[in-house]
């Protein structure tokens, strides 16, 4: 091969122009950067990057072609106390690589050293980057752009969603292709889903600790190459990108948006005892928040924290997000531990990354959802994100569970959460849709487990049941575990129905965990991040068709209620909502705070949710008018006109007049 030309400092990464490849890499503290390319026999050829524009190192390799494997060796000081951990004996992944060849195994050679550098060369076993060329025909693809007020989110794992689906061809189950299969798309449409939110699909690695226990990181919240698709979800790693885009194109044609769960808060390099894959060896001091002693600020619980206030790291994160939108046509992002995005190190609404997103004509137009906390001091930031963001509403999750399963929440607190938690989100011009309401999510109990287990059962995770939250607000209804008498099963079913109704008929944006609509259980494991098995894979052969139909009917009912889809805050006397007691009268102040758990919620003057969350059957006097129960609480043609509803214990019903 010929020597490198100077090349250009932008864009970041490796880019083929038809004649060769331009390579760029950011490092503010490097003294020298070597591009290492590998031929078909694995022979390494090294080239110094000749260009240095500010903190960007760059070079152009004529005649290089797509498929070329490469990596970097970055030279600089080994000064751990200062936060510098350069080690040119270690081959490093390009942070902007579009494809990775090789596996991130637990191997001592993939560690740089803790206090002293490890100068053993690791090129023979280190994963390599691959130069790719992008030619994809999107045809007439267009984003659905579903209004927030009409959005129904379905949180799912690429593999777990389809791996056991009997109607999807065996050879594509658990893959990107399966997401776009007609069987899957028809199911989502019939259920009423408008947005498929996928757990991380950017390439991730399993922590060495898990590998030593024979486990793996199933969820994917351990990123190593943020521009590359995780190859294990592809039928062929070489075609992963096109398989993913084919699925997105098919989902878009069905009117379904795709939202990616993305991890910009930490990397798979973990703490100082963790592996050296990329950022630590490229510019540790710039990419991470570093303490005065040279160690990491661990505001994520994962060993390190990305410094998203550093200009170069902001550019990196912004470029990553734009890549997924522009190259893959995704419709939005859910940001894991998103408080890190606003750290300066204090949390600020005008933090550099927030400002960059707001000013970007691409990113400011997609759906943005924050998990609004991290584990740093003042890490809980629910309600404090910039107006462009919606946020996971854990207030709603806990309130719904406490009201229906612990019976210890006053009516006033329940109503506040039902009304999109306006005390939290009604500020800075935000709309009710800013509250992403959920009862369950990938972390925590499934909905079925909420009514079957009082305690977590995480022994399979190998941490002696210490991991996972103890604050589950669950209720096993008298027996720990699945199964039981008919009476027990029916009481659990009623609780599931109550929780689903609360979720899907509340103001705000509902998010449904995949599998909750057909009774999926993780057998009490509330932190199944490392379980690549039947605990996480949805067993469609055991799905409860009745529960699925109930859920679908609720979603379709929601779409008929103007007070829920118009995405306007409810105001006194606007006709959107009236709160009534069991006698169809406005609740008194005392009833709101101390009254029995009986409530009628009149929406849009036509739809009535009658609630009896007490231990006894109770007569509920409905407001004036001819009321009849509607699906999923009655048949399609229900001639019964009801004046008084005999509300069963812990029951609810929806009527229309």
Curated annotation (Swiss-Prot):
SMART domains reported in the protein's UniProt record: Aamy
Keyword terms of this UniProt record: Carbohydrate metabolism, Glycogen metabolism, Glycosidase, Hydrolase
Membrane-spanning parts: none
Sites annotated Transition state stabilizer: 443
Pathway entry: Glycan degradation; glycogen degradation
Main EC class the enzyme belongs to: hydrolase
Record flagged with keyword rRNA-binding: no
Annotated EC: 3.2.1.196
UniProt GO molecular function: glycogen debranching enzyme activity; hydrolase activity, hydrolyzing O-glycosyl compounds
Pfam families linked to this entry: Alpha-amylase, CBM_48, GlgX_C
Keyword Hydrolase: yes
Swiss-Prot/TrEMBL catalytic activity: Hydrolysis of (1->6)-alpha-D-glucosidic linkages to branches with degrees of polymerization of three or four glucose residues in limit dextrin
Physiological role: Removes maltotriose and maltotetraose chains that are attached by 1,6-alpha-linkage to the limit dextrin main chain, generating a debranched limit dextrin.
Protein name, as recorded: Glycogen debranching enzyme
Gene from which this protein is expressed: glgX
């Amino acid at each position: 091969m010929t020597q490198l030309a100077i090349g250009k400092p932008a864009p970041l990464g490796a880019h083929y122009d038809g004649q060769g490849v331009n390579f760029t890499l950011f490092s503010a503290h490097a003294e020298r950067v070597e591009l290492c390319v590998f031929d078909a026999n694995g022979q390494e050829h090294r080239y110094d990057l000749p260009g240095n524009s500010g903190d960007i190192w760059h070079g152009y390799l004529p005649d290089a072609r797509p498929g070329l494997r490469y990596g970097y060796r970055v030279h600089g000081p080994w000064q751990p106390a200062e936060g510098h951990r350069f080690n040119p004996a270690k081959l490093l992944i390009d942070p902007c690589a579009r494809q990775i060849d090789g596996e991130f195994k637990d191997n001592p050679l993939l560690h740089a050293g803790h206090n002293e550098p490890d100068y053993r060369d690791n090129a023979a076993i280190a994963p390599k980057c691959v130069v790719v060329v992008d030619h994809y025909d999107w045809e007439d693809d267009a984003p659905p752009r579903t209004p927030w007020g009409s959005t129904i989110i379905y949180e799912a794992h690429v593999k777990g969603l389809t791996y056991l689906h009997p109607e999807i061809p065996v050879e594509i189950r658990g893959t990107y292709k399966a997401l776009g299969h007609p069987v899957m798309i028809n199911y989502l449409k019939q259920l009423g889903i408008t947005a498929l939110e996928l757990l991380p699909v950017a390439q991730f690695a399993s922590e060495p600790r898990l590998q030593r226990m024979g486990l793996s990181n199933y969820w994917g919240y351990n990123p190593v190459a943020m521009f590359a698709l995780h190859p294990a979800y592809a039928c062929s790693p070489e075609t992963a990108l096109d398989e993913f885009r084919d699925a997105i194109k098919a989902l878009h044609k069905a009117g379904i948006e795709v939202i990616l769960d993305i991890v910009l808060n930490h990397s798979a390099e973990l703490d100082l005892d963790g592996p050296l894959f990329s950022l630590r060896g490229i510019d540790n001091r710039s990419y991470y928040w570093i303490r005065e002693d040279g160690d990491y600020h661990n505001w994520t619980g994962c060993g390190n924290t990305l410094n998203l206030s550093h200009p170069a790291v902001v550019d990196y994160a912004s470029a990553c997000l734009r890549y997924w939108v522009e190259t893959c046509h995704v419709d939005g992002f859910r940001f894991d531990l998103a408080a890190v995005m606003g750290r300066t190190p204090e949390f600020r609404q005008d933090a550099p990354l927030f400002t960059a997103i707001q000013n970007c004509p691409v990113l400011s137009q997609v759906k943005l959802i924050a998990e609004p906390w991290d584990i740093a001091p003042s890490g809980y930031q629910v309600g404090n994100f910039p107006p462009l963001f919606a946020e996971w509403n854990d207030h709603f999750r806990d309130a719904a569970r406490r009201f229906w399963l612990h019976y210890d929440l006053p009516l006033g607190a329940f109503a506040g959460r039902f009304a999109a938690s306006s005390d939290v989100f009604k500020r800075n011009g935000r709309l009710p849709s800013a509250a992403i309401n959920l009862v369950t999510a990938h972390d925590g109990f499934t909905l079925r487990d909420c009514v079957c287990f009082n305690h977590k059962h995480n022994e399979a995770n190998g941490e002696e049941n210490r991991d996972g939250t103890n604050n589950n607000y669950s209720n096993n209804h008298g027996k720990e575990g699945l199964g039981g008498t008919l009476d027990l099963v029916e009481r659990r079913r009623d609780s599931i129905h109550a929780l689903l109704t609360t979720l899907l008929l509340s103001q705000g944006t509902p998010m449904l965990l995949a599998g909750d609509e057909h009774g999926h259980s993780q057998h009490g494991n509330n932190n199944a991040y490392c379980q690549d098995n039947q605990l996480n894979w949805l067993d469609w052969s055991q799905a409860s068709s009745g529960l699925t139909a109930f859920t679908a009917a609720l979603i379709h009912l929601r779409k008929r209620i103007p007070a829920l889809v118009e995405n306007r805050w409810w105001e006194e006397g606007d006709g959107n909502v009236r709160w009534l007691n069991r006698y169809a009268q406005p609740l008194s102040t005392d009833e709101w705070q101390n009254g029995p758990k009986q409530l009628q919620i009149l929406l849009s003057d036509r739809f009535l949710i009658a609630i009896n969350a007490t231990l006894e059957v109770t007569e509920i006097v409905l407001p004036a008018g001819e009321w009849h129960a509607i699906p999923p609480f009655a048949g399609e043609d229900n001639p019964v006109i009801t004046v008084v509803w005999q509300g069963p214990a812990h029951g609810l019903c929806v009527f229309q007049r």
